[in-house]
Amino acid sequence: MKIIILSGFLGSGKTTLLLNILKHNKEKNNSDIAILMNELGGFNVDSKIIGEETPYNELLNGCICCDLKQDVAVQISDLYHRHHPDYVIIEATGVAHPVKIYDACTDPVLTPIADVYNITTIVDAKRFLGRFKYTESTRRLMEEQIKYADIVIVNKIDTIENAERVELSHQLMQINARAQMIETSYSEIEFNLLEQKGNEQHGDIHMHHGISSVVYTFNGPIDSRAFVKWLTQLPDSVLRVKGFIKFRENKEQTVLFQYAYGIPQYEEELMNLPLKLVVIGEGLDKHKIMDQLDQLQFS
């Protein structure tokens, strides 16, 4: 099952784009699609206009990358087991950060059944050019939604002049020169977004523009001291490590491990879950990490 993360600031046209994707798919592709919609409030207007033929789940009263992050794996697993879709499209709230959504989608529980296929960000052309009137944190979010995208859809292009269009293109290229850039109005797309594969896969290595992840499967317990030593030498480019592991000191106990901003957390897990570790970061030397984890496993 493939996950498409649909990102973009408030009012950029995400829901209209989603409806156009569903319409295009129904007419030409006919893949099985399910939707996971996120809304900060307790009521999601957008979900009411999707139609009953498309399965969807909702995450309400919070942001998918903050308050509701732990619920993402549960909701995606539910969609998979109930509907077995080819794709799950996540329409995030406009203030969600794509890296944190990506993080939530690489939960070790999901890795056997789902893979992030592409990160698509839709941009309001005029609003983005005028982003400097917003706070620094808002401006940074708008830019980082573009930075980590595989596909950038520049929407409402009809609202700006030709000179502004050239300037906007220049600014977007400075932020993310590797993404596919599509200009449009009214969120209309002339291509099948479901066929735009944003990642390159080599076994258990998944890479997106600016952010990549490595999924490693252990076949048994590892030495805890060697594991801690490995953690201490991780570069700053490693943003997150998470997964289920066992240590040789207590071979029967599964441990939920999480690591962010240099801080490790260990929590006993009651269930006997697959021993998988996910490493997420920018510019990772993925093969080096795989080799290091091999050494942990076999030493």
Feature locations, PLM:
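C-terminal accessory "lid"/substrate-recognition subdomains
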Residues: 144-272, 284-286, 298-299
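Flexible loop/N-cap segments at domain edges
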Residues: 279
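Short, Lys/Arg-enriched, disordered terminal segments
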Residues: 1-2, 25, 294-299
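Nucleotide-state-sensitive switch-loop elements of NTP-binding domains
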Residues: 2-7, 12-134, 140
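A generic "cationic amphipathic patch" detector
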Residues: 19, 23, 30-31, 85, ...
